[in-house]
From Swiss-Prot:
GO terms for cellular component: nucleoplasm; nucleus. The gene is thap1. It comes from Danio rerio. Gene3D superfamilies: THAP domain. One of its GO terms (molecular function) is DNA-binding transcription factor activity. Residues 149-196 form a coiled coil. Keywords: Cell cycle, Coiled coil, DNA-binding, Metal-binding, Nucleus, Transcription, Transcription regulation, Zinc, Zinc-finger. One of its GO terms (biological process) is regulation of transcription by RNA polymerase II. A zinc finger (THAP-type) spans 5-57. It is found in: Nucleus, Nucleoplasm. Belongs to the THAP1 family. DNA-binding transcription regulator that regulates endothelial cell proliferation and G1/S cell-cycle progression. Specifically binds the 5'-[AT]NTNN[GT]GGCA[AGT]-3' core DNA sequence and acts by modulating expression of pRB-E2F cell-cycle target genes. InterPro entries: THAP1/10, THAP_Znf, THAP_Znf_sf. SMART domains: DM3 (SM00692), THAP (SM00980). This is THAP domain-containing protein 1.
Amino acid sequence: MVQSCSAYGCKNRYQKDRNISFHKFPLARPEVCVQWVSAMSRRNFKPTKYSNICSQHFTSDCFKQECNNRVLKDNAVPSLFTLQTQDPFSADVCFPLNVCATAEPLSECFPEQCGLPDGQEAGAVSCPEQCVPPGGQEAGAVSCDHNYTLEDCVQQKRRVQRLQEQMEKLRRRMKTLQQKCRRQERQLERLRANRGPAPLGDRYVILPRELYEELQGVETIGAVH
């Protein structure tokens, strides 16, 4: 699955020719993970093992300098979430935003409407849903919130269905083998029941040893005479 950024309004996806790296949420460190989610300012967002944030939302001091690859420090927290997001690694990289052209500029959004404290500029944070003009625009042009969790759920559902089908095939195969084993066991029991002592026939007679020796002596005397 192609890696994509979970930040609000960010449309970055993994491409080899772009100097952008993607970093997974530190789910193993809950305290740092909470700081990441809080910095994103996304309501009802729950990161999964497939969620990523691109390197454009981290300052250069968040990365380990001694590593050849782009590796985050243990206490690194993303902080670049303004609409004028800058890439600390490459100034030539374009950072597109899918914002409707007919939407009202942020300068016309008052701090009281956006829930901002007095003295804070509106351009420093993302404007919430109350400042988005209702109706008249396509939903895909206004809402840039994406996490691709729906795609993950669909893939997981398909995988579960495939596993269930494989299990059903294995159950049927096991049942067939069990029936075959039972038939072979019954056939073996019938063979054992039918097997008896081998018939001696008309040419063989069972005699005591003493009588056999006497008869053998009589035959010897007859042969001499």
